[in-house]
Structures are given as structure tokens and as C-alpha cells.
Swiss-Prot record:
Keyword Hydrolase set for record: yes
PANTHER family xref list: GLYCOGEN DEBRANCHING ENZYME (PTHR43002)
Listed EC numbers: 3.2.1.196
Record's keyword annotation contains Hydrolase: yes
UniProt-annotated site: Transition state stabilizer, residues: 445
Family note: Belongs to the glycosyl hydrolase 13 family.
Name recorded for this polypeptide: Glycogen debranching enzyme
Pathway note: Glycan degradation; glycogen degradation
Residues annotated as transmembrane: none
Gene, per the UniProt record: glgX
Annotated active site: 338, 373
Organism this protein belongs to: Yersinia pseudotuberculosis serotype O:3 (strain YPIII)
Function field: Removes maltotriose and maltotetraose chains that are attached by 1,6-alpha-linkage to the limit dextrin main chain, generating a debranched limit dextrin.
Keywords assigned by UniProt, alphabetized: Carbohydrate metabolism, Glycogen metabolism, Glycosidase, Hydrolase
Length: 662
């Protein structure tokens, strides 16, 4: 019979020391914590945790070994009005578990009870935590440490990026191993990608609503166990765990000079609202882990049913420990924080919130690339430009301005220029660098670039919500025909805008983020919220990729890396050599001139050598070039023996870059 000794309140979680396992669990309001050990047949042994130090319950299992299955039952008051929902009938996941065995189905036994505790036992249905102890030979792996000024981010989903790649063996497609395959790495290197940003690879589950419809949470933002690698993206090869496979992928990408950023979810948990499953924090210490209203209800500032209370001292440390685990165990180079405003809630947003202070004080984490999605749906949730130094931020104002300028004719050139210059009014005055602006035209959430040019309306019927989900404010333009089938004249305009938007993105000051597939002409058939589509709608179709567009994109990224004004990560100042703003006659734009003349035409001289010519009108135009000898440059022309230009005639919706002869 297993017996627990007192053990130690540290280290946190389940830790194998070579002789046994030390178990710890935080709960400030529990009356008793019971460790539940399971054998291979699922038989359960319950052992009361013998010691408590502060709010940490702990015990040591002599002779315990890696592979031990376990969970917890936590007893205490069931008093929803005070925020307490303890229920020992529910087996609970360790919030720090580093591996889980099993899946969470749509099972009524997970119900914890709304006003009264549900007494059905959930142990048989719940995945079991696994104690793991996996050493790994990193073979001298070092982070690529790409300067922010040279960073080009590529946002991708593990499965969506690799599932249909013809040069990756079928048994590896859709997995972490596929990320390490030479064919995938060659694509990233050919494009010029410096940083791969992966949608969540933390252990996530499918909401009951989706399971009832036969769908899944494809994006992975419904995280249950943030310390655990999701096994759904593992190849299942014998002897290779999901953790090892992810490590192999990171090591291979690092060897190719490519950074890896993980999209992490700490704004809410998979327990959803009061009617959701009791799986972890709700049953461990609901009042400590979640933001609650005065009457004990969940403060749903995320739109996902609950919001994690990241300003609580223990919850803050839980996040810091989790990030350090991913950094140390998987050598990741940074993190993108979903609904990042929640990180700073106290409950109002505060730049000096405990989690921000803890990140800044941690030498290892503060050296990582940290990216925030700067909003949630709560009061005061929109915080673009307000995150502390050390963070970069997804810039939706850049996105909407560039779409509006090129596709709708609704944005004047002054607004275009302000956002082309890394949205300087948002970031420069607050002491941030240009790289703080994560520029994007598209992201996983919304239309793909091609769909932006083919659909005026969203087409999300496959999501099972009668097309109610997804944004209606897309700033798109189908050029007179809804859908992918259109005549040659419409496609000519679409392709011109496709290249114009890519050029704008990759030659703007700030940090560009390219959505995987946009360089290939990937379409989701007008679905702008494909979060539950784990199928060919979201998987990149490499066989039909637009090869010319891929070459065009790669040429743009190479061009970007040559222009000091874009790579030095310093603000452009009036009169310096970084930028000159010119009108269609090649003359400097005065303050008054910005508001006069055609608002969709502009010339931008970068680093005194590269001239960006912009015609966002729906008609051809002629521009007079500034003094000097100008010639075409890839991907806009061939410089060898090229004609020296004094004027440029640009078709509708076009952008071009010329280079000045030495």
C-alpha cells in the first residue's frame, strides 16, 4: 500500500527526483486534498496529502517512477455565492501536469453542479496526469536571436501547414515531426522567414458544443493543461514522445536559423462558464484562479465563459513557471499571448500589473520575444499601444488602414503613411520601438489574403452557427463578383491588390507577420472564422500553390532585409536619411500638401535609395520620379541593363519599387 511522506512544498507540480515523486498542489480554500494514483487498469488509490505549507499541499511518494498516472480530489465548501465550487466527486487535472493520457469527451459526469454539487464520479472519464522525466540532448542548440529589426514572422498551424505537403512522408504530415522535415524548412528558408509562430500546441480539448456537431477546436485555444505538449500533433512513432518530437522540431528549426514562438493561452481555461465541465481549477480553488463578480459569477471578459485571475500571486507564478518550462524544456524563443489584455487586469488594465512586473524581473523571459494580442471584450479591453516596454503588439489599426487604403479607397494617404511608419503615433510617443508594431494584413482569425479579395461577405455556414460567428467588418473587396469564380478582368485587379498588400506589409516599418498560405494564394472559401475546421478548408494545398506569388513574396523579404530604414528599428525623423514622403510629381509633401491632391497616390524614398511608388486608385497614373537615375528591382523588374527611368506609369491598384543607381 502506497504511503505518502510529508515531502516538500517545492518544486511545484509532480517531480521525480530519482528515488520517488514529490507532489504539490496549490489551494488556498480547500479543506482537504487527496492524491489519486491509478494503475494501468485504471484502478484508483486515494491518499490524503499529509502536509500543508501555506497554501501548498504536498506529499512524497517513495519509489514512485515516471509514468505514474494521477489526479486530485479536493474537498471544501460548495458555496457559489462566495466563489467556492469544491466537489470531491470530480477527479481533477494537476494544473502543472506535463503530460496527459486520454481525451475529454462530452460526458455529463464532468458537470460540477450549478447551485448544488453534482455527485456523479468523473474519474473514469477524465484523462490521467502522467509523471514524466525526459532528458534530452540538445547537441549545443542555441537560439538564433534574430534582432527585432530583421524579424519576419510566419503564423502557422502545425497541421494546417504540413498535412498536405507532398514531400513530407504521409506518416509525418500534420505533426511536430513535419516541422523538422527538410522540405518544410526549405520552404521557410526560401521565403526568408526568420520566425515561425505556432498556434497553440498546449494540451487543448474540444468544447461539448463542437463535439455534439462532430466538429473540433482546430485552432487550439481551449487549453486544459498549459504545461503539456498536445499529443494530437505527435506522429506516434514508437519510442518518441510528443515532447521529444516537439524538441526535435525546435532543434531542427534552430539549426536552420529559424526562431520558434508559441501562441499561449492564459486568458481563460477549458472549463468554460458555470455550465461547463469541472476538470481542473474550478474544483481546485475557483475563487483564486478566476475573476468573479461580487455574487460569485464568472466575469466573462474573454467571451469564453471565464477569465483567469492572473494578478493573484500564485496564478502569476503559475504562468511564469509555465513560460519558463517551455523556454527551458523546449528552447522556444518567445510567446504570443492570446487576449493579452487579461495579462494586465487587476481587474482594470494596468501596465504595472503583477504578471507584467514578474515578466520584466525574469532575466530569461524578458529576453524572449513577447507579443500581445492587445484586447479582450471586457470594459477597457482595447489596449493597443499601452503594453509595457518589452512587448510587441498585434496591430489591428495597421491591418484596417492598409485594407481600407488599397481595397476601399476610404483611407487618406496621411493615415496610410502613419501606419506604414510602424503606427508611430501609437508607439513612438510611449517610448516603444518600431518593432513593437506587429504589422499584419491577415491572421488566422479572419479572411485569408486571397479571400479578402474575393468575398465581401463571410461564409461560415460550415461552423454550425448559421453564419452568425466571425466578424462582419472585414474591409474586403470582391471587385464585383462574390467568390473565387470570376472573369479575367476581375482577377487581374485582385492579383494586383494581392501583390500591393504583400508589398505594403513587407516594406512597412515595424515587424511584419505573414499568415501561412497567403504567399501561396490559399483560400478558405470565404470562411473568416475557421476555428473548428480541421479539414482541407484550412490545410494548405501545396499542389495548387501559386508559385509565382511565392517567388514574389520571397523577393520582397530579401528586398526588405537590404533596406536600413526597415531593419535598424529606429524611428524615422523628419529630415533624416531614412524616409522622404513625395507626391506624384516627385516633390516633398508639405504639411498642407498631405491633405491636397489625390489621396491614393504617393512616393516613399527609403534610405535615399529605394523608391516605393504607390497608385491605389482604380485608374492608371503617371508619376514623375525624383532626381536621379532609377531602375527596376526584383520582384518589380530586372536591374541588369535596365532602362533608366524618369517617369513611372502605374496601373490601377499597383505598387512598385525602384532602386537608385550609384
Amino acid at each position: 500500500m502506497a504511503v505518502l511522506t510529508h515531502g516538500s512544498p517545492t518544486p511545484s507540480g509532480a517531480y521525480f527526483d530519482g528515488k520517488g515523486i514529490n507532489f504539490t498542489l496549490f489551494s488556498a480554500h480547500a479543506e482537504q486534498v487527496t492524491l489519486c494514483l491509478f494503475d494501468e487498469q485504471g484502478q484508483e488509490r486515494q491518499i490524503a496529502m499529509p502536509a500543508r505549507t501555506g497554501d501548498i499541499w504536498h506529499g512524497y511518494l517513495p519509489g514512485g517512477k515516471p509514468g505514474q498516472r494521477y489526479g486530485y480530489r479536493v474537498s471544501g465548501p460548495f458555496d457559489p455565492s462566495r466563489g467556492h465550487r469544491f466537489n470531491p466527486h470530480k477527479l481533477l487535472i494537476d494544473p502543472r501536469t506535463r503530460a496527459l493520457e486520454g481525451k475529454v469527451g462530452d460526458d455529463p459526469r464532468f458537470t460540477g453542479g450549478v447551485s448544488q454539487p453534482d455527485v456523479r464520479d468523473s474519474a473514469a472519464a477524465l484523462p490521467k496526469c502522467l509523471v514524466i522525466h525526459e532528458e534530452y540532448d540538445w547537441q549545443g542548440d542555441k537560439p538564433p536571436a534574430i534582432p527585432w529589426g530583421n524579424t519576419v514572422i510566419y503564423e502557422a498551424h502545425v497541421r494546417g501547414l504540413t498535412q498536405l505537403h507532398p514531400d513530407i512522408p504521409p506518416e509525418l504530415r500534420g505533426t511536430y515531426a513535419a516541422l523538422a522535415h527538410p522540405a518544410l524548412i526549405e520552404h521557410l528558408k526560401t521565403l526568408g522567414i526568420t520566425t515561425l509562430e505556432l498556434l497553440p500546441v498546449q494540451f487543448h480539448i474540444d468544447e461539448p458544443r463542437l463535439q455534439k456537431m462532430g466538429l473540433s477546436n482546430y485552432w487550439g485555444y481551449n487549453v486544459l493543461a498549459p504545461f503539456a505538449v498536445d499529443p494530437d500533433y505527435a506522429s506516434g512513432r514508437e519510442g518518441i514522445s510528443p515532447l521529444r518530437e516537439l524538441r526535435d522540431a525546435v532543434k531542427a528549426l534552430h539549426n536552420a536559423g529559424i526562431e520558434v514562438i508559441l501562441d499561449v493561452v492564459f486568458n481563460h481555461s477549458a472549463e468554460l462558464d458555470v455550465f461547463g465541465p469541472t476538470l481542473c481549477q474550478r474544483g481546485i480553488d475557483n475563487a483564486s484562479y478566476y475573476w468573479l463578480t461580487p455574487d460569485g459569477e464568472y466575469d466573462n471578459i474573454t467571451g469564453c465563459g471565464n477569465a483567469l485571475r492572473l494578478s493573484h500571486p500564485y496564478v502569476t507564478q503559475w504562468v511564469i513557471d509555465c513560460l519558463n518550462y517551455w523556454r527551458d524544456s523546449c528552447h522556444v524563443d518567445g510567446f504570443r499571448f492570446d487576449l493579452g489584455t487579461v495579462l494586465g487586469r487587476t481587474p482594470a488594465f494596468d501596465q504595472h500589473a503583477p504578471l507584467f512586473a514578474a515578466l520584466a524581473a525574469d532575466e530569461r523571459l524578458s529576453a524572449c520575444k513577447l507579443i500581445a494580442e492587445p484586447w479582450d471584450i471586457g470594459l477597457g479591453g482595447y489596449q493597443l499601444g499601452n503594453f509595457p516596454t518589452g512587448f510587441s503588439e498585434w496591430n489591428d489599426q495597421y491591418r484596417d488602414a492598409m485594407r481600407g487604403f488599397w481595397l476601399r479607397g476610404e483611407v487618406p494617404r496621411g493615415t496610410f503613411a502613419q501606419h506604414f511608419a510602424a503606427s508611430s503615433r501609437l508607439f513612438e510617443q510611449r517610448g516603444r520601438l518600431p518593432s513593437a508594431s506587429i504589422n499584419q494584413i491577415t491572421a488566422h482569425d479572419g479572411f485569408t489574403l486571397l479571400d479578402l479579395l474575393c468575398f465581401n461577405q463571410k461564409h461560415n455556414q460550415m461552423n454550425g452557427e448559421e453564419n452568425r460567428d466571425g466578424s462582419d467588418n472585414n474591409h474586403s473587396n470582391n471587385f464585383g463578383c462574390e467568390g473565387l469564380v470570376a472573369d479575367a478582368a476581375i482577377w487581374q485587379r485582385r492579383k494586383a491588390c494581392q501583390r500591393a498588400l504583400l508589398t505594403t506589409l513587407l516594406l512597412s516599418q515595424g515587424t511584419p507577420m505573414l499568415l501561412a498560405g497567403d504567399e501561396q494564394g490559399h483560400s478558405q472559401q470565404g470562411n473568416n472564422n475557421a476555428y473548428c475546421q480541421n479539414n482541407i478548408l484550412t490545410w494548405l494545398d501545396w499542389g495548387s500553390a501559386d508559385r509565382a506569388l511565392m517567388t514574389f513574396t520571397a523577393d520582397l523579404i530579401r528586398l526588405r532585409q537590404q533596406i536600413p530604414a526597415l531593419t535598424q528599428d529606429q524611428w524615422w525623423q523628419s529630415g533624416d536619411s531614412n524616409v522622404q514622403w513625395l507626391d506624384s510629381q516627385g516633390q516633398a509633401l508639405s504639411d498642407a500638401a498631405w491633405e491636397q491632391g489625390c489621396q491614393q497616390q504617393l512616393q516613399i524614398l527609403l534610405s535615399q535609395r529605394w523608391l516605393v511608388l504607390i497608385n491605389a486608385t482604380d485608374h492608371e497614373c503617371e508619376m514623375h520620379l525624383p532626381e536621379g537615375e532609377w531602375e527596376g528591382i526584383p520582384p518589380f523588374g530586372v536591374s541588369d541593363h535596365a532602362e533608366r527611368l524618369t517617369t513611372w506609369r502605374g496601373s490601377a491598384h499597383t505598387i512598385c519599387v525602384l532602386i537608385k543607381r550609384d
